[in-house]
């Protein structure tokens, strides 16, 4: 005896296929994306017209093929005119309490001393660095290490200097192995927030940069606004 393929059974089969399709798509969405990396070299124009080459390497969390992924950390190697190499490293993890999350935008050498200008990459980093204004963190390289300096300690000829490295990291789908000075400037041209491309000599008033970030503090397992409510909340959820 033949079994009739009734409309009800057809609908049931279609429903089952739909559920299986949704389940497969949902499972695929939860497959962890592999960590990736990206690197390139760029030409850095110094204040005196000379040039050096830096090599930049980023570890990224997630992102298939050309997808960007979130930055885990970066390592920048500067090849100095005297043949020496110095390295700048920055970690972007919000889960650690230590100050981190700095993006560099300017490098130069004055009287043989390397200087680096950076900005906090996001509100958590800005609060980790005690909310500086101008919202930038400055360094010089002394005794084989990067040492934080104040704006007053920065050579005056570097005030108002414009970014001479690629700010942030290029889109992976458009990444090139090498960027000369012209290409670096082209990449930075669309940036309109002054503190991301200019060494500022005065505090920022208003604007859409990190100075507009609310005050947040570190709790046991996260960040939040100061106050009794958040303190009790994090005490409850932080196990």
Where are the predicted features?
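N-terminal secretory signal peptides that target proteins for export/translocation
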Residues: 1-10
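Phenylalanine-focused residue identity feature
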Residues: 8, 57, 78, 105-107, ...
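Bacterial N-terminal signal peptides
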Residues: 15-26
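Structured domain cores in non-transmembrane regions
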Residues: 62-148
């Amino acid at each position: 005896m033949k079994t009739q393929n009734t409309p009800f059974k057809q609908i049931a089969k279609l429903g089952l296929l739909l559920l299986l399709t949704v389940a497969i798509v949902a499972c695929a969405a939860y497959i962890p994306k592999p960590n990736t990396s990206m690197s390139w070299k760029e030409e850095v124009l110094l204040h005196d017209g000379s040039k050096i080459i830096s090599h930049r390497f980023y570890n990224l969390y997630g992102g298939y093929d050309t997808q960007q992924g979130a930055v885990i950390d970066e390592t920048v190697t500067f090849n100095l005119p005297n043949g020496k190499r110095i390295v700048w490293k920055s970690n972007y993890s919000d889960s650690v309490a230590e100050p981190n999350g700095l993006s560099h935008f300017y490098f130069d050498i004055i009287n043989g001393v390397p200087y680096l200008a950076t900005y906090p990459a996001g509100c958590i980093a800005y609060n980790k660095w005690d909310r500086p204004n101008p919202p930038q963190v400055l360094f010089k390289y002394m005794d084989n290490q990067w040492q934080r300096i104040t704006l007053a300690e920065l050579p005056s000829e570097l005030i108002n200097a414009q970014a001479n490295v690629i700010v942030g990291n290029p889109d992976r789908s458009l990444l090139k192995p090498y960027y000369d000075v012209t290409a670096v400037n082209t990449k930075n041209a669309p940036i309109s927030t002054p503190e991301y491309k200019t060494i500022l000599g005065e505090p920022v008033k208003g604007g859409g940069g990190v100075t507009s970030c609310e005050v947040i503090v570190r709790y046991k397992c996260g960040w939040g606004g100061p106050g009794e409510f958040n303190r009790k909340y994090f005490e409850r959820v932080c196990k």
